[in-house]
Regions:
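Transmembrane helical cores of multi-pass secondary ion antiporters/exchangers
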Residues: 8, 12-15, 22-25, 29-427
Length: 427
């Protein structure tokens, strides 16, 4: 997402920024009298301003948005109303639904078939490599147990679809790397990777709390992905039949798509313990189903969701920033940073192994390795769970999760933004 400010507006831009902080200085007023609408105004206005500023500085706009969340959040100025913070998780999920639906609407099954074996391996092998790297490095570096290292590894191993998917969609639009299905390969892997990592995380937590590392829980991973794909494709087919039979505006179709996605998320909560089912995979698969059965509509809906993403991106990354307690990042020290970078090297090695024997040349492999590094959404969602459960490694896990967001999200995004024209061929 890029913004441009002409020279004539620079003074106004500076005045707006200054005025905001002057206004925020009387924060007691906002904390006592503010409400959800005031908080949303702050989120979108300051998110736009800092996103624009960072774009001008040749840095990813999402970094400005994350910093916006840190500034507005409960650990700095505390200007966000509690009603916003209490539904932050749901709002972040809404943004994920929008971007994953866009991903599905652009993901041709034939392109994934072309990618073949690497597309399958990218769903789990890089994450396994990163967790293994953390298990090997963390006990010696930080003096923790192997199981605690596995918990930390599973927190930081998930790649962020919210960072990766929009960039891959841009590559598809510009026809960069599409001849070898590189954007589709990365996009599909980034979406499934999260499901795999979260199941491992919950398994490690149960084991740490005195339970057993159940093989059945590990079987849940492929089952939940397969069930999610089947449910999504069926839902996509039914929606196509509905849209062909009843004439309605595309905007109404977008609303229906969002409602179906929300119902799938609720369904996962209700039956997830008994029937392995990934709602986010299903959401993406709905888009895939629509593209397969009604490609003209898929392109029109993709344009609609692209416009929704303008606001959703700001909301998502500002709220991710609001979860970041900066004191944990400051306290993390050099050792935590070394662990994150070391684990990333293992992750990139995992990506390299996935691509062995593929048609990708050296430049394309380097690009894929870099594109698979950003962390944000999953770390914000699960980083604090071990601390809330009272685990000995809880504070350290949260610290490393926070630091991984601050380091990898902007670096990974910048690596993609400023290398793709050099590393990928335009078809």
């Amino acid at each position: 997402m890029r913004f441009s400010l002409c020279d004539n507006t620079k003074t106004a831009y500076k005045l707006m920024t200054s005025a905001f902080f002057c206004y925020a200085d009387s924060s007691a007023f906002f904390i006592k009298g503010g409400n959800m609408l005031t908080s949303l105004a702050f989120i979108f206005l300051l998110g736009l301003i800092l996103g624009s500023l960072f774009t001008k500085l040749k840095l990813p706009a999402l970094l400005g948005m994350i910093i916006t969340g840190i500034i507005l959040g409960p650990y700095v100025l505390n200007l966000l109303d509690s009603s916003i913070l209490s539904i932050s998780s749901s709002l972040r999920q809404l943004a994920l639904v929008i971007i994953l639906t866009r991903a599905g609407l652009a993901m041709d099954i034939e392109d994934l078939k072309k990618a073949g074996r690497p597309a399958f391996l990218m769903c789990f092998l890089p994450a396994l490599f990163e967790i293994t790297g953390t298990v090997l490095i963390a006990p010696k570096l930080l003096g923790i147990t192997v199981l605690e290292a596995a918990i930390i590894g599973s927190v930081i191993a998930a790649v962020s679809p919210a960072v990766v998917v929009p960039r891959m969609l841009k590559l598809i639009e510009e026809k960069r790397g599409t001849g070898k299905s590189i954007p589709q390969l990365i996009m599909a892997g980034a979406s499934v990777d999260d499901v795999f990592v979260i199941v491992l995380f919950t398994s490690f937590l149960g084991f740490e709390k005195g339970g057993e590392l159940s093989a059945i829980k590990l079987v849940y991973v492929p089952v939940s992905i397969i069930v999610g794909i089947i449910v999504g494709l069926i839902a996509g087919y039914i929606l196509v039949r509905l849209f062909k039979k009843f004439h309605m505006r595309d905007s109404v179709k977008v609303v229906i798509l969002l409602c179906v996605s929300f119902l799938l998320l609720e369904l996962e909560k209700k039956i997830g313990e008994k029937v392995p089912f990934s709602a986010l995979i299903a959401v993406m698969s709905i888009g895939v189903g629509i593209l397969k059965n009604y490609d003209i509509l898929a392109k029109r809906l993709s344009a609609k969701f692209s416009k929704l993403w303008v606001a959703a991106e700001i909301l998502l990354f500002v709220l991710v920033g609001a979860t970041v307690d900066i004191k944990y990042a400051v306290a993390a020290g050099v050792l935590a940073l070394i662990l994150i970078l070391g684990a990333l090297i293992f992750r990139m090695a995992g990506v390299f192994c996935c691509l062995l024997g593929s048609r990708l040349d050296t430049k394309e492999r380097v690009f894929t390795m870099m594109a698979y590094t950003p962390k944000a959404t999953v770390q914000a969602a699960i980083g604090g769970i071990p601390l809330a459960m009272g685990l000995a490694c809880g504070e350290l896990t949260l610290t490393i999760a926070v630091l991984s967001i601050l380091v990898t999200a902007p670096l990974g995004a910048a690596a993609v933004d400023y290398s793709y024209k050099k590393l990928l061929k335009q078809e």
